[in-house]
Design a protein with these regions (language model features):
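Single conserved hydrophobic/aromatic residue that forms the stacking wall/gate
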Residues: 1-12
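Extended acidic/polar, glycine-enriched regions
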Residues: 13-45
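Conserved SET/PR-domain catalytic core that frames the SAM/AdoMet-binding pocket
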Residues: 10-16, 145-156
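Active-site region of the double-stranded beta-helix
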Residues: 5-6, 23-26, 33-36, 49-146, ...
C-alpha cells in the first residue's frame, strides 16, 4: 500500500517484502546492508528529503546532495545511508578532498562500505573514479560510463566528470559499527576543506 500514493519519493521496506511494478517499465534502486534487527517500513516523501548544495565553479567542486535516508531517519534504518549526488554544471570533482572511511578508529574515522551507480548527461559522457589505497603511493582509476557501478571498501576515492558533462550517482553507505559517517581526509589535501564553500556543512549531514 505504501507504493500506491502519487508523488511517491522513496520507500523503506522490511527485509521480507514483495514489490510489484504496475507500469510497463520502471527503474528501481534497491539499497540495503547487514543489520541485526528487523525494522518497520515507512514512506519517504520528496518534501522530506534533505538537500545540501556546496562547492563552487571556481574550485571545480560544485555539487548537490539529496539525503534520501539522511539524519531525519537516524533511528529507523539501522546503519544505512542513501543519497543522490549531482554535479552542478558541467565537469568538476566530487568526493574531494580525497577521503576514506575504511577503518574504525573514532574520533578520526569510521568503517563504512560504499556502492556508487553513475549516470551522465548527455548519456555518452564519462568520468573517472580514482582509487588510492596508501598515502604517497600511486593509485589507479576506473573509467566510468552511464550505468557503471563501483563498490568501495578501502582507500581514498575522489571522482571526476569530464568537461561538458553532468554526473549523477546513487550512493549506498553501510556502517560496520555505527550509522554516522566520519570521513578521514588525506593530510596532503585536507587544507582544501577551508577553501571549498559549504563543505563542512555537507560533512555534518552524514549522521
Amino acid at each position: 500500500d505504501l507504493v500506491r500514493s502519487r508523488g511517491l519519493g522513496d520507500v523503506y521496506k522490511r527485509q521480507e517484502c514483495t514489490i510489484t511494478c504496475l507500469s510497463d517499465s520502471t527503474e528501481c534502486f534497491i539499497a540495503g546492508g547487514i543489520y541485526e534487527k528487523k525494522l518497520e517500513a515507512f514512506l519517504v516523501q520528496k518534501k522530506e528529503i534533505d538537500t545540501v548544495q556546496y562547492g563552487s565553479d571556481d574550485t571545480k567542486t560544485h555539487r548537490k546532495i539529496k539525503h534520501i535516508l539522511g539524519a531525519k531517519h537516524h533511528e529507523q534504518v539501522g546503519r544505512l545511508l542513501v543519497n543522490e549526488l549531482y554535479t552542478v554544471g558541467a565537469g568538476g570533482w566530487s568526493g574531494f578532498p580525497p577521503h576514506k572511511h575504511d577503518t574504525n578508529r573514532l574520533p578520526d574515522e569510521t568503517r563504512h562500505d560504499e556502492v556508487y551507480n553513475y549516470r551522465f548527461r548527455p548519456g555518452h559522457g564519462f568520468g573517472v573514479q580514482v582509487m588510492q589505497y596508501e598515502d604517497d603511493k600511486e593509485g589507479f582509476g576506473y573509467q566510468l560510463f552511464n550505468g557503471s557501478t563501483i563498490a568501495i571498501d578501502k582507500g581514498y576515492h575522489p571522482c571526476v566528470v569530464a568537461p561538458g558533462y553532468e554526473m549523477y550517482y546513487f550512493t549506498i553507505l553501510v556502517g560496520l559499527s555505527q550509522r554516522s559517517l566520519v570521513q578521514y581526509f588525506q593530510k596532503t589535501h585536507a587544507y582544501q576543506l577551508e577553501t571549498i564553500p559549504g563543505i563542512k556543512d555537507m560533512i555534518a549531514k552524514y549522521k
